[in-house]
């Protein structure tokens, strides 16, 4: 019995020390396949990026082992002195990265990601069934900003709060601030959200703040997509005008998957007659909404990864990278325009563009599937004026990930031509099908036609040969 227990215990110790490739060949194989897909493919999904080796090392550290419910100095567990040190360092760097005075701003770095961060703000500042206004999802907003259809409330935000979206002009794709102002005066929201997931122009934060002030509302910026650009100072910052700013940390900021909530603190206003000061109470409201309101223990390994990313975001190299992201996006937009494609709003101020395929006679869902088969990853997206979200007309394309791999403007001109050839192939497939053929039938034709598969293979080989010339950031084994 003792010999058997000793053998089992030795086997147990071996299990704890084995590398992944020996411990779990199936998971290791999947990771290797995904690593190869990223290496040989062109990643154009605007919300994706390639985290640095240092960020991934922090993410895979022993910090994963530690529970630490609560906040620095106020934990519900012992053994958290170094966790406190880490979280306070991350908070300090977050304020430094965005040039914020710690007397006027605070930050919570515990949200698990952007969606929980947003919901924590709503929970903190808007009573149940209180009113929220965000950019409509089909017009470039995010699901968490209150999306619902005529028949169904989709996002939990629209279930637990009353949501009224604001819109863009269908003709230009630009936000209709006049209509927002008019609707806000009737709806009287408690919170207005300045944030997007597919909008290629800078937001008018000053105009949004005035609308918020006129209606006694808070203004919250969701800068998830542009947080790296904001840190580098290459796009307008929301901090001058907003009461609260939320963000993810894995898009243009190029960290691991997590979220942050910045909030104003200190003096909010001074009575001109009495001189009495009124103070912000956002800190306690937001912190209690994150924990214990919506979350348990923070993910300390992720907080470490965020801290590393924030340090990198304060470097000259990071600013050069973000400037290149913008230059590459302009190059991609210009090249596609020259090839005859319509870009919503006519261009971009940031890291993404939305390509409208209606004039070409196809849609985003079909083009996405063909491009994916050719090792080009992007995503279908609704365009202003789309009749159905089930058949979006556009493709959203972003430059952060490929810029992290070292692609420059001339490289994105080649990428544009690869995209063009993929869409031409999409149209070729459609020409051999009924006008009302479903997406399912289209995918069957794409997968089952030998001639089409041969054309796909030819383009895929060219794409993969091109992409393989650029290194992939991250851990060397993966």
Swiss-Prot record:
The protein's matches in CDD domains, at most eight in alphabetical order, are given as: SHMT
Alphabetized GO MF terms: glycine hydroxymethyltransferase activity; mRNA 5'-UTR binding; mRNA regulatory element binding translation repressor activity; protein homodimerization activity; pyridoxal phosphate binding; serine binding
Q: Which domain of life is it from?
A: Eukaryota
So which cofactors does this thing need? pyridoxal 5'-phosphate
Reactions accelerated catalytically: (6R)-5,10-methylene-5,6,7,8-tetrahydrofolate + glycine + H2O = (6S)-5,6,7,8-tetrahydrofolate + L-serine
- Give the GO biological process terms: cellular response to leukemia inhibitory factor; cellular response to tetrahydrofolate; dTMP biosynthetic process; folic acid metabolic process; glycine biosynthetic process from serine; glycine metabolic process; L-serine catabolic process; L-serine metabolic process
Give its localization.
Answer: Cytoplasm
Give the matching NCBIfam families. PRK00011.1
Family (UniProt): Belongs to the SHMT family.
Q: Provide the function of this protein.
A: Interconversion of serine and glycine.
Its assembly, as annotated, is: Homotetramer. Identified in complex with FAM175B and the other subunits of the BRISC complex, at least composed of FAM175B/ABRO1, BRCC3/BRCC36, BABAM2 and BABAM1/NBA1.
| Any further remark recorded for this protein | In eukaryotes there are two forms of the enzymes: a cytosolic one and a mitochondrial one.
- The molecule here is called Serine hydroxymethyltransferase, cytosolic
- Natural source organism: Mus musculus (Mouse)
